[in-house]
Amino acid sequence: MYAYKGFEPDLSCRGYRFVMGKNVTPEANCASNGFHCAEDPLDCLSYYGDMNRSIYCLVQPGGDIDEDDRDSKIACTELTILRQLTRKEFFLHALAYICLLYTSDAADEL
């Protein structure tokens, strides 16, 4: 599974400083703890909306995973930061996600 995460320019999020590669925490709950990311890149904009200041990365969630029922947000106990995305890459990933949702929804209706 791959997901997306927004960060402050120094790779921090809510006071925690992430590092490239694997990051580990003991608990994962979408409402209160764990490392958060989103399956839909565009959901990152709800939390890190200033694209001129924030950075966005392709990540791989692992360990215990808790999913949110409001959007595609995920909390996990392991988060591997794979790489930073350029703005163009971010929107290409978002478009691919939308196309994947559309084609899977369309296939379900057949």
What residue ranges belong to the model's regions?
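Negatively charged, Asp/Glu-rich surface segments that serve as flexible interaction/assembly modules
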Residues: 67-101
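Conserved small/polar residues in nucleotide/adenosyl-binding loops
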Residues: 102-107
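ADP-ribose/NAD+-binding catalytic cleft of ART/PARP-like enzymes
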Residues: 1-33, 52-55
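Generic structural motif
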Residues: 7-9, 61-64, 84
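ADP-ribosyltransferase catalytic core
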Residues: 25-79
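Generic surface-pattern signal
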Residues: 9, 49-50, 96-100
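Extended, polar beta-sheet/loop recognition surfaces of beta-rich domains
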Residues: 110
